[in-house]
């Protein structure tokens, strides 16, 4: 009874009862149809009112369907309250509520309900234990006791229940127990085999996973997809590709797994290539596929391909949900088309945290600091709770605008109002904010008060601030720290050399250059940029004239420099030597 102790009796508004009674016949078939068609919780309450009036709330079949409808609206308070009024709920009613508790993430209450079920002498079914084992994944201490009950009530060799047990043990990291259940099964279907293969994949034991899969009489798509996912997770792309190519039939999950795997391994061009190959094969992508491909376009900065993929979603009836929507906002922002990013964002019917984060990050990255902060304020007004990622973008915006006091206020709010613990990115953002504003010593003090060792990003931000504000004393401190963390990074050497040269400290310049020669450090990776024109990528590197159109490019640059000079722009060349 503990599961129901905190649920008050439901009071159904009288107007619901009158309106509903007047509009339909209260026979069970009609009520069953109405419950199935309920589109809002209020209509569900009206259906319950009609059931109570005619005592049909004692009808187990009707209550089974009613509880299922309550689950879809996450209104288990209605389901529980109604069940407590039933005189003799049967196993199907209990099973419906078990499923509801598991679906709505209330595992303990499902186990408490199981105790009541046994006390009421209602015999469990196989479906009962399938739901309860899933609940035990969230409360593992009940799992072993439940397994004893499974044997007690004669379900010890039930394939579906045993398969659920395998998944339960693997979810709690007990791979040996999972394999023991699998080995003791007198019969195994494809789902049981795939679940055990997935259990090995979950603990990254791909040798065992592959060995077990090879024992199957015939691998199915689900098993192969599981193996591909596992090898991609380990970065073994060659093995994943081999398995994929050997599959006689590839479903949408197979293709999407490859696309996601390439993206996770930063092989974005391959991810996009697989997507186009998938289209050639006539496989229709789903929302997961599309959002993954759009994200790959974002990482590559290929605006034209991103626009093509976006157009495909529009022409093929994809709903602009939060997943595709946030991916599009992120893609357009990273590809430099902020106007399109804003257009997508404002046209989203629903916006989740990822959508807000994407647009705030995009605005901040493009230098629209005030707009990013206004968007953050609007996000708070709409009661969307920011996360750690949100604040990284907000601190970037504050840095661009030089809003030190606002940055301090938001930093305190992050800790006090949202209980977010500062991570290295937050500290890096604040150090960058202080350093760029010339508060070098305050930035150094913040670094000293960090609860963990600062990384190269933080010391690099301080060093850059020292360059801007010509603080050579603190620059040398930051440089020495960086030499411990990243001694082969040429950028730090060149930055300090430029500061020494600016102050005519040529002996120090020679010393740093000598150290670089001893370590074999040189600027081997010049700055590069790329542009895509007519489906061709053009890559340009600093001082590189190998491009076929380099002469035309140089002429155009000269013209741009002349126009900039006429506009009053003065080049800063003091750091060039």
Curated annotation (Swiss-Prot):
Write one Pfam family the protein is assigned to.
E_motif
Q: Which organism is it from?
A: Arabidopsis thaliana
**A GO molecular function held by the record:** RNA binding
Give the protein name, as stated in the record: Pentatricopeptide repeat-containing protein At1g06143
**Gene3D superfamilies linked to this entry:** Tetratricopeptide repeat domain
Instruction: Report the superkingdom from the record.
Output: Eukaryota
Q: Sorted alphabetically, which keywords does the UniProt record give?
A: Repeat
Similarity remark = Belongs to the PPR family. PCMP-E subfamily.
Phylogenetic classification of the source organism: Eukaryota, Viridiplantae, Streptophyta, Embryophyta, Tracheophyta
Q: Where are the transmembrane segments?
A: none
């Amino acid at each position: 009874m503990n599961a129901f102790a905190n649920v008050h009796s439901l009071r159904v508004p009288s107007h619901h009862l009158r309106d509903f009674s007047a509009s339909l016949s209260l026979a069970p078939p009609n009520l069953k149809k109405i419950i199935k068609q309920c589109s809002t919780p209020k209509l569900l309450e009206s259906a319950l009112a009609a059931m109570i009036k005619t005592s049909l709330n004692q009808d187990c079949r009707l209550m089974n369907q009613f509880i299922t409808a309550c689950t879809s609206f996450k209104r288990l308070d209605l389901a529980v309250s109604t069940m407590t009024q039933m005189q003799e709920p049967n196993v199907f009613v209990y099973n419906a509520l078990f499923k509801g508790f598991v679906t709505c993430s209330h595992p303990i209450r499902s186990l408490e309900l199981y105790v009541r079920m046994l006390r009421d002498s209602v015999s469990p079914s196989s479906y009962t234990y399938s739901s309860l084992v899933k609940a035990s994944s969230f409360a593992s201490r009940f799992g072993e006791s439940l397994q004893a009950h499974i044997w007690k009530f004669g379900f010890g060799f039930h394939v579906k229940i045993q398969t659920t047990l395998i998944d339960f043990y693997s979810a709690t990291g007990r791979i040996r127990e999972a394999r023991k259940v699998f080995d003791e099964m007198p019969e195994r279907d494809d789902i049981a085999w795939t679940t055990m293969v997935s259990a090995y994949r979950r603990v990254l034991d791909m040798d065992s996973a592959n060995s077990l899969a090879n024992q199957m009489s015939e691998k199915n798509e689900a098993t192969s997809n599981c193996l591909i996912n596992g090898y991609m997770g380990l970065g073994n792309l060659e093995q994943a590709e081999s398995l994929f190519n050997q599959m006689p039939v590839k479903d949408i999950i197979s293709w999407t797994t490859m696309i996601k795997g390439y993206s996770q391994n930063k092989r974005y061009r391959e991810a996009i290539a697989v997507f186009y190959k998938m289209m050639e094969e006539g496989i229709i992508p789903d929302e997961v596929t599309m959002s993954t491909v759009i994200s790959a376009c974002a990482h590559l900065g290929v605006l034209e391909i991103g626009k093509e993929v976006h157009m495909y979603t529009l022409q093929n009836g994809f709903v602009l949900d939060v997943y595709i929507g946030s991916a599009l906002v992120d893609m357009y922002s990273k590809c430099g088309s902020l106007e399109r990013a804003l257009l997508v964002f404002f046209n989203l019917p629903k916006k989740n945290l990822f959508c807000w984060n994407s647009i705030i990050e995009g605005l901040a990255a493009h230098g629209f600091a005030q707009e990013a902060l206004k968007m953050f304020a609007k996000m708070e007004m709409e009661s969307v709770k920011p996360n750690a990622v949100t604040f990284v973008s907000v601190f970037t915006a504050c840095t661009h605008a030089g809003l030190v006091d606002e940055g301090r206020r938001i930093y305190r709010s992050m800790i006090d109002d949202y209980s977010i613990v500062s991570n290295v990115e937050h500290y890096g953002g604040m150090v960058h904010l202080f350093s760029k504003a010339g508060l070098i010593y305050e930035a150094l003090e913040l670094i000293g008060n960090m609860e963990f060792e600062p990384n190269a990003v933080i010391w690099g931000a301080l060093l850059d601030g020292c360059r801007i504000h010509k603080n050579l004393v603190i620059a040398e401190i930051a440089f020495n720290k960086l030499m411990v963390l990243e001694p082969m990074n040429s950028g730090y050497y060149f930055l300090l050399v430029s500061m020494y040269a600016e102050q005519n400290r040529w002996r120090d310049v020679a010393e740093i250059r000598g150290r670089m020669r001893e370590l074999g450090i040189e600027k081997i990776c010049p700055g590069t940029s790329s542009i895509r024109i007519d489906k061709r990528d053009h890559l340009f590197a600093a001082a590189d004239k190998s491009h076929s159109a380099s002469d035309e490019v140089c002429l155009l640059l000269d013209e741009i420099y002349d126009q900039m000079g006429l506009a009053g722009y003065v080049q800063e060349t003091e750091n060039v030597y």
